[in-house]
Each structure stands twice: as structure tokens, then as C-alpha cells.
């Protein structure tokens, strides 16, 4: 693990070497925007905003992307909810449990699913306000996504309205699936088959399927 220390950001940013190629870009942007970001009460907290940079990328096949963190109590790990109270992760867990016949579980976390990286397009929001930090991340969001694209085989974007323009995000041809947001109206996500579609796409690429059941805390 490496560490990035900045003049205008008081928290050391730990990162895996797989992110090295964009660290200078991150440094330049945060040196400029960090002071304004520090003035906000954020979700996740300032020291946890870059937590996912600790994740390796070479061992990832799929990246699941949400638009931004929970507006309260985000941990820095996308979709993570330590007390399993968040509607989004509960809907995800219920969808996967129905498909793979997991009946009893206490929580779900993509962090434990081999080959999967969970990511937020915007790494933070103002506490209580979704999509409120677009201005802080617009210079880095696509940089992150395109860097991840060099490693993974499939992107799964959660939210048809949020990611309707995904083709303008990616600079290179990448297999992309855009599904319903877990909190979508009319409970469209309940019958969404995208987790299995992702596995079918991996098989077509002669890559191992994802064992989504690994994310359950039983």
C-alpha cells in the first residue's frame, strides 16, 4: 500500500499500486478543490472518501457503479451499510437471495465478492443531499471510470436515468450493462436479472462467473 500526502488535504490517502497511473491527476485536482470540500459536512466523512483506492484492480472482473454515496452514514465502501438499514443494499440482497436461494442473511457487502469492485461515480455528497458534490468530482469521475475500465471486463451501472449517457463516460469500448436503481419506483429492481446477465457476459468472454452469494453475511 502506498500513501499520498497533500498540502490542501489533511488526511493521507492510502492507495494500491494499481491506481498509480492516475495518482498525479488526483493530487492536482484535490490540491485545488480539497479546501472547498473540507468546508462541507460530507458523506462519507472526509477521511473515508478515498477508501476504495485501497482496493486492487488486477483481480477484478466486474465494477458495479452507483451515482454517489448514501447521503448519511456512508462508510467509503459503496453500498455498504453496517447495520443493514439502507434501502439500496437491502433491495440488492433481496434480488440476489431470490435468484440464488439464500433464505436467511444478516447483511450484504460487495467487498466480500471475489472479482467485484463497488464504486461511486461521485465519491462524496453533502450530508443529507444526494448528487450535491457533482461540482467537486466532475474533473475526476470519468478519470476514475476509465482507469478502472483498463482492468475490468464488465461495468454494471445502477440507475438508468443516472447513467443514460454512459457512452460519453467511457473512452474505450467496454462491455456495459445499465440496470434499474435498487430504489427505483414500482420496484422494477425486484425482478431485474442483471446479476445473472453479468455472469453470462463473463462466460462469453471465457472468464469465471461471479459468485454473488459471497456477499452475504449469514
From Swiss-Prot:
<comment type="subunit">
    <text>Homodimer. Interacts with protein A20. Component of the Uracil-DNA glycosylase(UDG)-A20-polymerase complex; A20 and UDG form a heterodimeric processivity factor that associates with E9 to form the processive polymerase holoenzyme.</text>
</comment>
<comment type="similarity">
    <text>Belongs to the uracil-DNA glycosylase (UDG) superfamily. UNG family.</text>
</comment>
<dbReference type="InterPro" id="IPR018085">
    <property type="entry name" value="Ura-DNA_Glyclase_AS"/>
</dbReference>
<dbReference type="GO" id="GO:0003677">
    <property type="term" value="F:DNA binding"/>
</dbReference>
<dbReference type="GO" id="GO:0097510">
    <property type="term" value="P:base-excision repair, AP site formation via deaminated base removal"/>
</dbReference>
<dbReference type="GO" id="GO:0004844">
    <property type="term" value="F:uracil DNA N-glycosylase activity"/>
</dbReference>
<dbReference type="InterPro" id="IPR002043">
    <property type="entry name" value="UDG_fam1"/>
</dbReference>
<dbReference type="InterPro" id="IPR036895">
    <property type="entry name" value="Uracil-DNA_glycosylase-like_sf"/>
</dbReference>
<feature type="active site" description="Proton acceptor">
    <location>
        <position position="68"/>
    </location>
</feature>
<keyword id="KW-0378">Hydrolase</keyword>
<keyword id="KW-0238">DNA-binding</keyword>
<keyword id="KW-0227">DNA damage</keyword>
<protein>
    <recommendedName>
        <fullName>Uracil-DNA glycosylase</fullName>
        <ecNumber>3.2.2.27</ecNumber>
    </recommendedName>
</protein>
<dbReference type="Pfam" id="PF03167">
    <property type="entry name" value="UDG"/>
</dbReference>
<comment type="function">
    <text>Excises uracil residues from the DNA which can arise as a result of misincorporation of dUMP residues by DNA polymerase or due to deamination of cytosine. Also part of a heterodimeric processivity factor which potentiates the DNA polymerase activity. Binds to DNA.</text>
</comment>
<dbReference type="InterPro" id="IPR005122">
    <property type="entry name" value="Uracil-DNA_glycosylase-like"/>
</dbReference>
<keyword id="KW-0234">DNA repair</keyword>
Amino acid at each position: 500500500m502506498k500513501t499520498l500526502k497533500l498540502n490542501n488535504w489533511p488526511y493521507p490517502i492510502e492507495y494500491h499500486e494499481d491506481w498509480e497511473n492516475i495518482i498525479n491527476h488526483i493530487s492536482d485536482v484535490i490540491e485545488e478543490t480539497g479546501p472547498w470540500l473540507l468546508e462541507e459536512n460530507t458523506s462519507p466523512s472526509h477521511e473515508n472518501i478515498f477508501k476504495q483506492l485501497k482496493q486492487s484492480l488486477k483481480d477484478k472482473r466486474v465494477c458495479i457503479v452507483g451515482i454517489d454515496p448514501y447521503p448519511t452514514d456512508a462508510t467509503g465502501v459503496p453500498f455498504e451499510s453496517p447495520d443493514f438499514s439502507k434501502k439500496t443494499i437491502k433491495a440488492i440482497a433481496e434480488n440476489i437471495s431470490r435468484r440464488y436461494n439464500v433464505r436467511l442473511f444478516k447483511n450484504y457487502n460487495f467487498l466480500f465478492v471475489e472479482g467485484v469492485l463497488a464504486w461511486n461515480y461521485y465519491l462524496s455528497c453533502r450530508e443529507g443531499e444526494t448528487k450535491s458534490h457533482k461540482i467537486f468530482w466532475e474533473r475526476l469521475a470519468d478519470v476514475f471510470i476509465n482507469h478502472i475500465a483498463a482492468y475490468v471486463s464488465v461495468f454494471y451501472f445502477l440507475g438508468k436515468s443516472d447513467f443514460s449517457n454512459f457512452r460519453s463516460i467511457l473512452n474505450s469500448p467496454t462491455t456495459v450493462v445499465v440496470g434499474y436503481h435498487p430504489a427505483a419506483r414500482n420496484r422494477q429492481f425486484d425482478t431485474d436479472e442483471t446479476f445473472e446477465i453479468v455472469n453470462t457476459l463473463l462466460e462469453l468472454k471465457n472468464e469465471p462467473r461471479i459468485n454473488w452469494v459471497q456477499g452475504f453475511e449469514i
